[in-house]
């Protein structure tokens, strides 16, 4: 199975990816563009050195480079379970994604969150972690919105795009994702792991009383 998480900054993609791995799919490989580029930039290859120079200078990494790095990693994993977080971010990347995972069991999850909820989360996170996320939030969201509809349109031509209302509490979103992925047999396992790993008894409730933080 290959899972793709798409959503705006602050929608909880990173949080949900980690929950899915920790509680349901322990062999899941979570791939993010930023981590893959960082890994590639330190391998000493010609491409890796080019990426390092651009990252050090704050330059934009071309789509072709991002696609190449992702494909290289995916090929190395063979038939392992994969979750791609935050990719694609352009129409070109969307078309490449379909080619990379051709004939794979591809599950695309689109996180939908209101701007108000996103802003609330970003402000809360910046206060808790002394980060200035709110200062760049509008810019990141604007960039995301410019390409999002085209990306969804491209992906939906050949695959089902599953929309998840991510305005809810963390546990409620996790439950919906598990069901939509067809992992119903994992629900009890997920509940047990949620209870054991994350919350005392009074906090276990689907859709309520979650204290975990959202990450993009």
Question: Where do the protein language model's features map onto the residues?
Answer:
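Glycine-rich phosphate-binding loop of ATP-dependent small-molecule kinases
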Residues: 1-216
């Amino acid at each position: 199975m290959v899972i793709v998480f798409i959503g705006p900054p602050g929608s909880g993609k990173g949080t949900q990816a980690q929950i899915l791995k920790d509680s349901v799919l322990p062999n899941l490989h979570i791939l993010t563009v930023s981590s893959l580029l960082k890994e590639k930039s330190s391998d000493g290859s010609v491409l890796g050195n080019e990426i390092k120079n651009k990252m050090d200078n704050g330059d934009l990494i071309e789509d072709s480079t991002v696609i190449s790095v992702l494909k290289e990693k995916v090929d190395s994993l063979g038939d392992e379970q994969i979750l791609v977080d935050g990719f694609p971010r352009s129409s070109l990347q969307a078309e490449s994604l379909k080619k990379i995972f051709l004939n794979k069991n591809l599950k695309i999850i689109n996180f939908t969150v209101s701007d108000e909820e996103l802003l609330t989360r970003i402000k809360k996170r910046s206060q808790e972690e002394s980060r200035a996320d709110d200062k760049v939030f509008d810019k990141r969201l604007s960039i995301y919105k410019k390409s999002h509809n085209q990306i969804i349109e491209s992906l939906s031509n050949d695959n089902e795009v599953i929309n998840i209302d991510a305005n809810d509490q963390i546990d409620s979103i996790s439950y919906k994702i598990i069901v939509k992925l067809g992992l119903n047999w994992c629900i009890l396992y997920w509940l047990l792991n949620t209870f054991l790993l994350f919350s005392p008894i009074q906090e276990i409730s689907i859709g309520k009383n979650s204290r975990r933080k959202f990450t993009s």
